[in-house]
Amino acid sequence: VLGQKLFRKQLSMYQNAEFSSYLFGGKHFQSCFARDLLERESNVILLDEFDKAAPIFHSAFYQLFDEGIFEDKNYNVQLQSSIIICTSNYKSIEEIRSYLGEPIFYRFDNIIKFDKLSTDSLIKIINLIIDKKYNELTPSEKKIVDIENIRLMLYKNVRKLNNVRNIKNIIEELIGIELVKNTLEDK
């Protein structure tokens, strides 16, 4: 699984009538979920923010979760050897069952609860992202950016950081501020 490409669909983007056509198959020339599945490059499928899709659409996934087959009015996609991951923002198993409903809930093989990242994990993430972003800088930019100062600033505020996206955005912003500040001071 690790190192493989990921087929990802952001279900929060599909909350209207157009999603029905996309999910159940519209005209043959229209974009649809089944065709996207056929063209995927990975057997790891991420249905991100599964909880955001309207409950009326859950039935489209019953056969996929039960038998590994996704079928719309135009295509039949065999996915038996795939790993399907659905994410949501629910806080408990009871909340998942209540909001999604039992028919879809009991089709999930396993539920993994997300816990806040430990301080050690956050520091490892900080270091990985800082090193990656620093290596992307040009030699002249590296002379301007005090990367160790940024690293120390983040270490001191590590418990205020929430997730990888948050850390990445802050690091990019801090590097950007240093570059802009230096450019303005040179003028």
Segment roles from a protein language model:
Residues 9, 45-46, 84:
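Hydrophobic positions in the central parallel beta-sheet of the AAA+
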Residues 41-42, 167:
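Eukaryote-biased detector of low-complexity, proline/serine/threonine-rich segments
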Residues 2, 24, 28, 38, ...:
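Signal for well-folded cores of large energy- and translation-related assemblies
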Residues 11-41:
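Short glycine-rich substrate-engagement loop in P-loop NTPases that contacts/grips substrate
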Residues 2-3, 17, 38-41, 55-56, ...:
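Short loop/turn elements that form and flank the Walker-type P-loop nucleotide-binding site
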